[in-house]
């Protein structure tokens, strides 16, 4: 999905993953076609009924860690390539958001930028092509610059940028400073700390990932209690976060059964409504 949005960069799916190429490969054409079909279906079924609509893409750091250069190894290995993919994503998002806004003119658009690899990228945890080494870590100033390209393009297009990652030890201060309006995270991996409280006080919303992504026995009361405990440890009572609370699954739901996906979304709605 992230590659389907890129502007001016073509790629093809190889046996070992996506690789940049001279032209648009069949798999990238298919990805772009599926994206258009998804929007067509949503427009047909939802039309003007959406008050808010969330779209999502892989972020620049994660893309750089996943996509290979034409001659091999990840784009992460090259400073210029990292910047190129961020610029391409920023430009592509402007076009993508404009298309979504044309289809859903009355909706408030939220763009979720998925960065599951951000911690590994910034701590030197991404293996090289040989598997015997690790790519150098991307330092905070560069990570900030790359993410700012994305948040600026989203904001300029009239949408709301939200960062999502299920990784532990997120660089919360960096994300807040990069222009994200909200941070979506796995509550089970977040340690209550001053940085979360400071971020929330600065106006960055916290999207609390607390509903299990896979089938589980849990009640809305138990989920609500976990949220209340977290915010209480940060020094906030219910009134402080009631109007800013967004309840989400802990991480992606690709592995969930259809039945649990429905249950999880229902639980999230019920818990959010309790406030």
Model-derived features with residue positions:
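Active-site loop segments of alpha/beta catalytic cores
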Residues: 88, 92-192
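Short helix-terminating capping/connector loops at secondary-structure junctions
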Residues: 47-50, 102-107, 156-158, 237-243
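Glycine-rich anion/phosphate-binding loops
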Residues: 27-43, 83-96, 221-229
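Alpha-helical structural signal in soluble globular domains
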Residues: 45, 103, 149, 153-157, ...
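Active-site-proximal loop/turn and secondary-structure-junction residues that shape catalytic pockets
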Residues: 59-61, 115-117, 167-169, 189, ...
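Alpha/beta catalytic barrel-like cores
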Residues: 1-58, 62-82, 174-179, 204, ...
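Hydrophobic faces of well-ordered beta-strands that scaffold small-molecule active sites
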Residues: 51-59, 109-114, 161-165, 181-185, ...
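Catalytic-face loop-and-helix region of soluble metabolic enzyme cores
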Residues: 181-274
């Amino acid at each position: 999905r992230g590659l389907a949005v890129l502007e001016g960069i073509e790629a093809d799916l190889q046996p070992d993953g996506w690789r940049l190429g001279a032209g648009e490969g069949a798999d990238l054409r298919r990805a772009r076609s599926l994206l258009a079909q998804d929007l067509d279906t949503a427009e047909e079924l939802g039309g003007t009924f959406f008050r808010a609509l969330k779209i999502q893409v892989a972020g620049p750091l994660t893309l750089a860690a996943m996509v290979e250069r034409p001659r091999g190894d990840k784009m992460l290995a090259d400073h210029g390539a990292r910047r190129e993919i961020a610029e391409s994503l920023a430009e592509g998002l402007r076009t993508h958001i404009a298309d979504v806004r044309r289809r859903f003119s009355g909706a408030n658009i939220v763009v979720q930028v998925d960065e599951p690899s951000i911690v590994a990228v910034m701590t030197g945890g991404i293996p090289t092509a040989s598997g015997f080494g690790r790519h150098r870590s991307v330092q905070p100033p560069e990570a900030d610059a790359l993410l700012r390209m994305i948040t600026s393009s989203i904001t300029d297009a009239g949408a709301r940028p939200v960062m999502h990652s299920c990784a532990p030890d997120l660089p919360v201060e960096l994300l807040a400073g990069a222009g994200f309006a909200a941070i979506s995270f796995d509550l089970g991996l977040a340690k209550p700390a001053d940085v979360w409280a400071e971020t929330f006080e600065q106006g960055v919303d916290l999207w609390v990932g607390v509903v299990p992504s896979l089938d589980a026995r849990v009640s809305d009361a138990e989920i609500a209690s976990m949220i209340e405990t977290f915010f209480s440890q940060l020094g906030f009572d219910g009134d402080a976060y009631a109007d800013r609370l967004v309840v989400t699954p802990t991480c992606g739901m690709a592995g969930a059964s259809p039945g649990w996906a429905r249950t999880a979304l229902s639980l999230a709605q019920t818990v959010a409504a309790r406030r």
